[in-house]
């Protein structure tokens, strides 16, 4: 069994052990108050994978890190996984946007090979133009296609197949334009849309300049609102909690709950601009707490959470890096090195592998994504 000690206060202390996995099934946790009282340990079953499923090892496979009333239990037999990528059907949506003066113009839309034309006179308005275009598109009777009108735009969505669409309008041809899953510049986005509408902003051909904008409707449904940074709709939202270290929480006197941690989801970017932490696809060897960050070591990498957000290993913005963002570094050495333990010191983090040791630190003692380095 893996034994551990928890000291809540001078008068509330506990001794616990993680019992090894039997021939079948999973391990278990027993805890006693130092006064001899047997404690209640509840195994959480509210998630898709029960918490006890994480207890697959023996005493050599577990590491326990206790911070206040929570103990983080790491099993180095478990390979960390990300949540599955969602199903994303490209070009199933399209947005027609009006710009410029609506007076005395001709507007043309081609939807799935069907051409629609609408002309305005001196009394033309955005509302009359969009109403006419919507009526004409709806009259095509395309199966699965729905059209929604906003103040300066029409949104098309097809539940069956991709949409083929083009549009022109005005004397220069740019008073009516259309986009689907991406735009060249953020200024092309309409002022109204539906809640959680995600559009890729290209900016340039470089991947690092690309980001995703998500529409936040004021009423949580559609209409007026604002655009904020969002996540690539084709990529995973974050960590698979069933494969990550679990928490043992002291919920009351002599009562504990063992459960998955509510890891913060990835909210912005994609795998290029806001990648998963380096321990995804690897086995975590141990956890540590330093500089108001929770950290894990896996293979030759050290990953640390957002500052003061211990369960968040993702950046808050894909466009800029802040000092509070996660830190994720690899040990530089000519020999393979697997970090197996970590010792916090006043100078930094002392990292131990089987044959070498390293120091992770910064010049001013505060670890940040841009100022932290690892040296032998």
Spans of features found by a protein language model:
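C-terminal globular interaction/adhesion domains in large, modular proteins
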Residues: 225, 231, 237-265
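Post-signal-peptide, soluble extracytosolic/periplasmic N-terminal scaffold domains
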Residues: 85-87
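Hydrophobic core register within WD40 beta-propeller blades
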Residues: 3, 64-65, 287, 342
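Extended, beta-strand-rich, solvent-exposed assembly scaffolds of outer structural proteins
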Residues: 4, 11-69, 75, 95-169, ...
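Residue-level marker for isolated small/hydroxyl-bearing positions within beta-strands
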Residues: 18-19, 74, 297, 352
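Short glycine/acidic-enriched loop and turn motifs that connect beta-strands
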Residues: 22-24, 79, 301-303
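Acidic/polar, low-complexity linker and loop regions
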Residues: 27-53, 77, 249-271, 321-326
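Beta-propeller and closely related beta-pinwheel folds
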Residues: 261-292, 297-376
């Amino acid at each position: 069994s893996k034994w551990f000690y928890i000291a809540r206060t001078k008068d509330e202390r506990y001794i616990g052990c993680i019992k090894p996995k039997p021939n079948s099934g999973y391990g278990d946790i027993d805890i006693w108050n130092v006064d001899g009282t047997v404690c209640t340990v509840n195994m959480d079953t509210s998630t898709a994978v029960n918490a006890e499923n994480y207890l697959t090892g023996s005493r050599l496979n577990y590491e326990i890190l206790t911070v206040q009333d929570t103990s983080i239990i790491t099993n180095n037999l478990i390979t960390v996984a990300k949540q599955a990528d969602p199903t994303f059907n490209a070009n199933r949506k399209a947005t027609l946007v009006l710009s410029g003066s609506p007076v005395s113009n001709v507007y043309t839309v081609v939807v799935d090979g069907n051409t629609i034309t609408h002309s305005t006179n001196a009394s033309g308005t955005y509302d009359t133009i969009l109403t006419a275009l919507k009526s004409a598109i709806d009259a095509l009777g395309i199966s699965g296609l729905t059209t929604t009108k906003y103040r300066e735009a029409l949104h098309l969505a097809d539940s069956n197949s991709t949409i083929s669409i083009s549009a022109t309008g005005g004397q220069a041809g740019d008073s009516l334009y259309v986009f689907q899953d991406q735009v060249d510049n953020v200024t092309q986005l309409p002022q109204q849309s539906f809640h959680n509408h995600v559009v890729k902003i290209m900016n340039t051909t470089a991947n690092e300049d690309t980001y995703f904008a998500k529409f936040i409707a004021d009423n949580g449904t559609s209409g007026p609102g604002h655009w904020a940074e969002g996540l690539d709709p084709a990529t995973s939202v974050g960590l698979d909690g069933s494969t990550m270290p679990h928490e043992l929480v002291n919920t009351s006197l002599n009562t504990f709950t063992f459960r998955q941690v509510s890891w913060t989801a990835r909210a912005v970017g994609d795998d290029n601009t806001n990648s998963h932490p380096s321990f995804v696809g690897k086995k975590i060897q141990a956890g540590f707490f330093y500089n108001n960050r929770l950290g894990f070591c896996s293979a030759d990498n050290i990953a640390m959470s957002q500052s003061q957000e211990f369960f968040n290993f993702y950046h808050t913005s894909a466009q800029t890096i802040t000092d509070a963002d996660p830190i994720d570094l690899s040990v530089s050495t000519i020999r393979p090195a697997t970090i197996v333990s970590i010792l916090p010191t006043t100078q930094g983090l002392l990292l131990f592998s089987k044959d070498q040791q390293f120091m992770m630190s910064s010049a001013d003692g505060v670890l940040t994504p841009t100022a932290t380095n690892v040296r032998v």
